[in-house]
Regions:
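Substrate-binding pocket helix/loop in short-chain dehydrogenase/reductase
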Residues: 84-85, 92-97, 188, 192
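Short C-terminal tail/terminal secondary-structure segment
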Residues: 212, 223-238
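Catalytic loop of short-chain dehydrogenase/reductase
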Residues: 124-146, 151-160, 172
Length: 238
């Protein structure tokens, strides 16, 4: 895994940041994409990109493909978008699929030709406990479920080329975004913790550990799988 070149989307916050740090610590060359890059001490090569803009995304991926021999792609972008069923509108539904699925498709399409040629590669998609169902998250659950379907489909398609494709599905994670919605000690936090058998939030670095494992040599024969990092929150009967 050392000296591998890994592209990470959503690389400057939360899980994407933790993944980038872990990869750099293991000697990987990290290429990060994020909307805001000013004043960030990133452990690799960082590029500004509005991933909501398909044209801008495609052009930057072309530039990166010509500059770096990307061995692996980690799709981290895709913020949670809670809304009750009665409040779902087409704009939010399309936005969820755009950020969670279209961006991943573009990123993978850009670098799969090189992986096929080298007969080696890794793709990890960040999905979430939401793929097992979560009230009030229609658009987000649908988009992440679609990404999980892509994961399994790509795994079958790329296995003959030695490329593995897997998903990591975290439950609630201790991030600034989470705390903005669920302050420590709030009723909102208590409601979330009640859904986690282990009684605490995941740390971003714990999720990153699962991602980095799937990128490593020890996971060379694992493909098409979903690893939950959710403290038991996706288990039936919880």
């Amino acid at each position: 895994m050392k000296n591998s070149c890994v592209l990470v989307t959503g690389a400057t916050k939360g899980i994407g940041w933790a993944v980038s740090q872990r990869l750099a610590d293991q000697g990987c060359h990290v290429v990060g994409l994020a909307r805001h890059v000013a004043d960030i001490d990133f452990p690799g090569y960082l590029y500004a990109c509005d991933l909501a803009n398909a044209g801008e995304t495609e052009e930057l991926l072309r530039v990166i493909r010509e500059k770096y021999p990307v061995d692996a792609v980690v799709n981290c972008v895709g913020p949670a978008m809670p809304e009750p069923l009665g409040e779902v509108d087409l704009a939010s539904l399309y936005q969820a699929f755009d950020l969670n699925v279209r961006v991943a498709v573009q990123a993978v399409q850009a670098f799969v030709p090189g992986m096929r040629a080298r007969k080696s590669g890794r793709i990890v998609n960040l999905c979430g406990r939401v793929v097992h169902g979560q009230a009030g998250h229609t658009s987000y659950a649908a988009a992440k479920s679609a990404l999980l379907g892509c994961t399994r489909t790509w795994a079958l398609e790329l296995a003959p080329y030695g490329v593995t494709v897997n998903a990591v599905s975290p439950g609630p994670v201790e991030t600034g975004l989470f705390r903005a919605e669920c302050p420590v000690g709030s009723d909102a936090e208590k409601t979330v913790l009640a859904t986690i058998p282990m009684g605490r939030l995941a740390q971003a670095d714990e999720v990153a550990a699962a991602v980095v494992f799937l990128l490593g040599d020890g996971a060379a024969f694992i493909t098409g799988q979903e690893i939950g990092v959710d403290g038991g929150g996706s288990l039936a009967g919880r």
